[in-house]
Amino acid sequence: MKIKALSKLKPEEGIWMTEVDKPVLGHNDLLIKIKKTAICGTDVHIYNWDEWSQKTIPVPMVVGHEYVGEVVGIGQEVRGFEIGDRVSGEGHITCGHCRNCRGGRTHLCRNTIGVGVNRTGCFSEYLVIPAFNAFKIPANISDDLASIFDPFGNAVHTALSFDLVGEDVLITGAGPIGIMAAAVAKHVGARHVVITDVNEYRLDLARKMGVTRAVNVAEQKLDDVMVELGMTEGFDVGLEMSGNPSAFNSMLKTMNHGGRIALLGIPPSDMGIDWNQVIFKGLVIKGIYGREMFETWYKMASLIQSGLDLTPIITHHFKVDDFQQGFDIMRSGMSGKVILDWE
C-alpha cells in the first residue's frame, strides 16, 4: 500500500510531496496513524540543505519528528498500549545496551538515532516507532499541543535543569523553544524572566506568553533593562537557545557569580568564549540534548494540566497539501509553531 509523505528527495533546497510504501510493523513497534505534525527548525535546516544537513541526512528520506497520532497497529511483543491510544513520541531512538542506557540515562545514549534525521520520519500518513518511544497523551491535552511535545520537551528539559523558584532568568533566543522555556520559567516561580532577540515578531509572541521583559538587543541594552528591574547582581540562571556567539557572550557578562547556564542552542564550532567570565564567576555550564526519557514527558503533561498555556506559540495551521506555505512562513521567521493537518 502506498501512502502520502513529505520527503527529502534530492540533495538540494526543498522538500517534496511523494508516495512511499506504508511502513512495516515490527514485533516491538507501534503503527501510528498521523493526525498532526509540526515543522521544526531542524526541518527548515533540512529544507535549506545547509552544511549540517548535507553531512547528516540520507537522501531520499521521509522527514519530520514532531507529531501526534493514533495507535492502529501493535507489535506482538508490545504491552501497555491499545488500539486507539492517542500518542506522540520521543524522536531519539536509543540503543538500550550502552552504559547510559543501562543506567537509565537514555537521553545520553551515545548511539542515538533521530526520527526524521537518521531514519524515516513522521511527515507521512503512518509512522512506525519502537513502543518504548511512544508517550500516551492525556485526554485533556489537545492534538495541537501534543504535536509540539518534542520541542516543548527541549524547553522543559532546558528550563528545569536548575532550580528557578525566586530566581532571575535570562533566555537568549526567542525562537519557539526559547519562548516556551520562558513560559515554563514563569509558571514554576521565577521572579524576572527576560528574553532577548532581534526578531520583533517573536519578541511580541514572548510578551503574549507572559515574560517579564522581551528585549530587542539591536535597540536596547540588557544592562539598562536590569537597572529598570532593580537587579543589582546579575542573572541567576541563563538558558541559551540561539547558538549566537554574541548572545552567549552577553549572557556570560550579565550572569551573577555562581550562576548556572543551560546550553541548547548550537553555536558555530569555532565560537570564542571569554573563559575568564566562567572561571572567576564560578559559572556552571550544562549542555542539553533532547529530553530526559521519560521524566521530561511527564513534566510536560503536568505543566499543561496545571495551567501552563502554550496556545499562543502555535501561530499557523495548514493542510498537509499546503505544506509549502508552512515551510515558507517558517523560513521567513514570522511565525511561532506551524502545524500541518494530515486528516
Swiss-Prot record:
BP terms from Gene Ontology: L-threonine catabolic process to glycine
Gene3D superfamilies: Medium-chain alcohol dehydrogenases, catalytic domain, NAD(P)-binding Rossmann-like Domain
Pfam families to which the protein is assigned, alphabetical: ADH_N, ADH_zinc_N
Cofactor(s) for this UniProt protein: Zn(2+)
Residues reported in the UniProt entry to bind Zn(2+) 1: C40, H65, E66
Residues binding Zn(2+) 2: C95, C98, C101, C109
Catalytic activity annotation: L-threonine + NAD(+) = (2S)-2-amino-3-oxobutanoate + NADH + H(+)
Pathway(s) per entry: Amino-acid degradation; L-threonine degradation via oxydo-reductase pathway; glycine from L-threonine: step 1/2
Domain of life: Bacteria
Keywords: Cytoplasm, Metal-binding, NAD, Oxidoreductase, Zinc
Principal location listed in the UniProt entry: cytoplasm
Places the protein is found: Cytoplasm
Cofactor note (record): Binds 2 Zn(2+) ions per subunit.
Single GO term (MF): L-threonine 3-dehydrogenase activity
Reported function: Catalyzes the NAD(+)-dependent oxidation of L-threonine to 2-amino-3-ketobutyrate.
Membership in a protein family: Belongs to the zinc-containing alcohol dehydrogenase family.
HAMAP family in the cross-refs: Thr_dehydrog
Subunit structure: Homotetramer.
NCBIfam families listed in its UniProt record: PRK05396.1, tdh
Listed name of the protein: L-threonine 3-dehydrogenase
Gene: tdh
